[in-house]
């Protein structure tokens, strides 16, 4: 599996945010020239740490626009987001693991979103929820940033206007799957300080043949 290695770029211009550089590499555990024992031990240690991270994701209680309503609906008893270990909503970004950009990222709001993202402690992740956060949506105007990934690194995109709560739950599952494949430093003092993220396949491409093969559409009373 191919991985994307992300490191801080000390030579990045001040105008660029975030100041990081990326490159495509192979699985770091396969490239390590160590003995079988140490290699297996590091693999087990990485898997254990990733298992704990992905099953205890604390979201930051933050919303910009109407998609936030659908996000909060996922925390009700009907959908029960506690099944995925993400029911502990935090009021401070310093206590959260990830933030969901749910709504329209206005230019005036972009510096605030950046500051909140910087206050998240590592490891941290970002979910872009809805067409407005993904690409500006129908607001192709001067006051809206055309995609939150213009100033934040996004891990999972949720399409829709607005997406249903089930789409948010699927995004959580995709984020958990991505976290399970990550290779992060086991210490801030020892070893490579880069972050290796697995290049996950696009969900649209995975189910393309299945969608094309559909010939019998359900009637409105069965939807």
Curated annotation (Swiss-Prot):
Its main location: membrane. It is a peripheral membrane protein. Keywords: 4Fe-4S, Cell inner membrane, Cell membrane, Iron, Iron-sulfur, Membrane, Metal-binding, NAD, Quinone, Translocase, Transport, Ubiquinone. One of its GO terms (cellular component) is plasma membrane. GO terms for biological process: aerobic respiration; electron transport coupled proton transport. Its cofactor is [4Fe-4S] cluster. It is found in: Cell inner membrane. Binds 1 [4Fe-4S] cluster. GO terms for molecular function: 4 iron, 4 sulfur cluster binding; iron ion binding; NADH dehydrogenase (ubiquinone) activity; NADH:ubiquinone reductase (non-electrogenic) activity; quinone binding. NDH-1 is composed of 14 different subunits. Subunits NuoB, C, D, E, F, and G constitute the peripheral sector of the complex. This is NADH-quinone oxidoreductase subunit B. It comes from Tolumonas auensis (strain DSM 9187 / NBRC 110442 / TA 4).
